[in-house]
Amino acid sequence: MWDNATTMMVVEGIFVTLYMTLATTFMGYVLGLPMGIALVITAPKGLRPNKIIYKVLDVVVNVVRSFPFLILLIVIQPLTRIIVGKSYGPTATIVPLTLSAAPFIARMVESSLLEVDHGVIEAAQSMGANLWTIIWKVMIGEAKTSLIVNVTI
C-alpha cells in the first residue's frame, strides 16, 4: 500500500509523538504533582492553611488551564528558546505542552487527594505523624489508585 519512504515517515512520526507524549507526561507530573499537593495542603481546610499561597496557585492553575494551547505556544516561545536552545521541533514543543499539562495534572492530583477520608488524616495526626508522613504515606497512599487512574487521562 505504501512505499518504503512513506512507511519510514509514518514510523518516525509515531516515535516523535511517543517521545513528546511521554516526556510531557513525565514533566507535567514533575510540576503538577507538587502543585496539586500544595493546593490541598494550603487550602482553607488543609493541613497548613495559607490563604496567599493557595490563592496564587489557584489563580495560576485556572488561568493557564483556560489559555488556548497555540497562544501559550507563542507567548512562551522566548522561554522555550532559553530552555531548549530553539523554538521549533519536537523537543521545543515539550516545554509549552508541559506548561499547559501541569495545571490539569495539578487539579487531578488535588481532586484525588481531596477524596481521602479526613478521618484517616486525623488518625495519623493523633498518632504524631509529621506533615511529610501524612502527605506521602497517608494522603498519597490512600489516593494511589485514583492517582494511577488519572495518569491514563
Segment roles from a protein language model:
Residues 113-143:
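Short helix-to-coil transition segments within interhelical loops
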Residues 18, 22, 131-153:
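Transmembrane alpha-helices
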Residues 30-37, 92-95, 99-121, 152:
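Membrane-embedded alpha-helices of multi-pass transport/permease systems
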Residues 38-76, 97, 108-111, 115:
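Cytoplasmic-entry segments and transmembrane alpha-helices of multi-pass inner-membrane transporters
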Residues 12-20, 62-65, 69-104:
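Loop-to-helix entry region at the N-terminal start of transmembrane alpha-helices
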Residues 10-41:
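Transmembrane alpha-helix signature in integral membrane proteins
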Residues 10, 14, 18, 56, ...:
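Hydrophobic alpha-helical elements at and bordering transmembrane segments
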Residues 1-5:
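Short membrane-interfacial helix/loop motifs at transmembrane-helix boundaries
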